[in-house]
Every structure is written in structure tokens, then in C-alpha cells.
Curated annotation (Swiss-Prot):
Reactions performed catalytically: 1-(5-phospho-beta-D-ribosyl)-5-[(5-phospho-beta-D-ribosylamino)methylideneamino]imidazole-4-carboxamide = 5-[(5-phospho-1-deoxy-D-ribulos-1-ylimino)methylamino]-1-(5-phospho-beta-D-ribosyl)imidazole-4-carboxamide
PANTHER family according to UniProt: 1-(5-PHOSPHORIBOSYL)-5-[(5-PHOSPHORIBOSYLAMINO)METHYLIDENEAMINO] IMIDAZOLE-4-CARBOXAMIDE ISOMERASE (PTHR43090:SF2)
Pathway: Amino-acid biosynthesis; L-histidine biosynthesis; L-histidine from 5-phospho-alpha-D-ribose 1-diphosphate: step 4/9
Signal peptide: none
UniProt entry tagged with the keyword Isomerase: yes
GO cellular component terms listed in the entry, alphabetical order: cytoplasm
Protein name, per record: 1-(5-phosphoribosyl)-5-[(5-phosphoribosylamino)methylideneamino] imidazole-4-carboxamide isomerase
SUPFAM superfamilies: Ribulose-phoshate binding barrel (SSF51366)
Places the protein is found: Cytoplasm
Keyword field: Amino-acid biosynthesis, Cytoplasm, Histidine biosynthesis, Isomerase
């Protein structure tokens, strides 16, 4: 299995931002130079990038179609992108706009049957399921929903197995407690997922801070890692991460 580094940009109101643990009230701005940053990813040798529409994630209705198209045409990057995907037409339109892969998050928790139907329609290489998780006091990985204020009926384990059995290929999993904290990814979580669903290509997300974290994700058998804050704040050099 090849290992992919996904440099990431989260966009809100046309600006590159980062949220701390997904909290819109704890937002850091990094400028509005989206296309130049994407070009820099490509210049460093990246093949893929991860693009998140935070406006759509909150209100629905993907807003980055034009930006996505510009990035795909100008840089040649394969773009994995999502935010606010609510319907089959959302998936189709984002793919038509230039996405290589569409990320489906909260809907994948709320309506797995619908999303499994999309897997069969669009193909496993065109969709990534993104599951945000938090470990409860009993050690169970739960799936917070509705802005992380409620907990889904299904656990992470149950949903990961369900999607794996349905033919899912790409799973992006974020430990909410690590997101934006630069505290290192949760190695135990990803080892658990790899053991539970070895057929899935698991992407590490949340907490990556240095080359050791990238190397650890690769050594653990994960398929890739999403790098956001560490790149934006200069804690990690993309060239070195790609060569890891």
C-alpha cells in the first residue's frame, strides 16, 4: 500500500483558517491566498491535497466549486474535498467541479444506507468517509454528531465495520481531542482501526506536529496522513514529509 501525504486547507469566508477541536469560535486566520498555497503544495511534490469547506460543513451547500476547479486546473493536484455534502447531487456536482474524491462526514453517520448506495454508484475510489471520534470513559470510540454536541447510536467500530463490509476503501478518522492541538496523532486509535478493518485504507487526521508523526503513521500501516496546522505554522516542512 502506498502512503499519501495530504497537505490540507480549511476554507471559511474565502480565507484559510484552522479551528481548534472543530470549534468555530476558536478560529485562526492564515490569509486568503488559497490558490498560491495549493500551488506551493504541488511545487513541493505533493500529488494530493485535502480541501475543506467549513462554511458548507456548518450550513450545507458546497461553496468551493470554483476554487476547486481552479486548483485542479492550475496545479494538477488530485483534490480530496468535502464539507456540507447532503445529497447524491452534491457528490456528483463536486466530482464534476474537479474533485478526485469527495469526503462525506456527518451524513455518513446519520444515513449509512444512503452513503453505501453512493459507494456503489460512484465507486470506492471516488469517496472518502470521514469519521470524527471521541473516546468515552469506558474506552469506547463514540461518534459525536450535530457539532459534536450529541452522540450517534452507532460506535466508530460498528460503522467502520459496516462500511468496510459494503466495499468502502478510504476512511479518514479524526480523534477530536487531538484536532488542531499539535499533540501528536492517537497511535492507539489507528492501530485499533487497522486491526479491526485491515481492508480499509485509513487516513490519519488530527494532531500531527512533526516528521516523527508522519513516519509513525506510515509505519503503522496507515494509507496516508492529513497535515494542516503543522504546515501552516511551520512546524513541519512539506518537502520532508513527502520524502518520509
Amino acid at each position: 500500500m502506498s502512503f499519501t501525504v495530504y497537505p490540507a486547507l480549511d476554507i471559511r469566508n474565502g480565507r484559510v483558517v484552522r479551528l481548534l477541536q472543530g470549534d468555530y469560535a476558536r478560529e485562526t486566520h492564515y490569509g486568503n491566498d488559497v490558490l498560491p498555497r495549493a500551488q506551493a503544495f504541488a511545487d513541493a511534490g505533493a500529488q494530493w491535497m485535502h480541501l475543506v469547506d467549513l462554511d458548507a460543513a456548518k450550513a450545507g451547500g458546497y461553496t468551493l466549486a470554483t476554487t476547486l476547479g481552479e486548483i485542479a486546473r492550475a496545479t494538477g493536484l488530485q483534490v480530496q474535498t468535502g464539507g456540507g455534502v447532503r445529497s447524491r447531487d452534491d457528490v456528483a456536482s463536486i466530482l464534476d467541479a474537479g474533485a478526485a474524491r469527495v469526503v462525506i462526514g456527518s451524513l455518513a453517520v446519520r444515513d449509512s444506507e444512503m452513503v453505501i448506495a453512493w459507494l456503489q454508484e460512484f465507486g470506492a475510489d471516488r469517496l472518502t468517509i470521514a469519521l470524527d471520534t471521541r473516546q468515552d470513559t469506558d474506552g469506547i470510540w463514540q461518534l459525536p454528531v450535530h457539532g459534536w454536541t450529541e452522540t450517534a447510536d452507532a460506535t466508530l467500530d460498528q460503522l467502520a465495520v459496516r462500511y468496510a463490509q459494503a466495499g468502502l476503501k478510504h476512511l479518514l478518522c479524526t480523534d477530536i481531542a487531538r484536532d488542531g492541538m499539535l499533540s501528536g496523532p492517537n497511535a492507539a486509535l489507528y492501530a485499533h482501526l487497522r486491526s479491526l478493518t485491515p481492508q480499509l485504507q485509513v487516513q490519519v487526521s488530527g494532531g500531527a506536529r512533526n516528521l516523527a508523526d508522519v513516519a509513525a503513521a506510515k509505519a503503522a500501516g496507515c494509507a496516508g496522513i492529513v497535515l494542516g496546522k503543522a504546515l501552516l505554522e511551520g512546524h513541519l516542512d512539506l518537502d520532508e514529509a513527502l520524502a518520509c
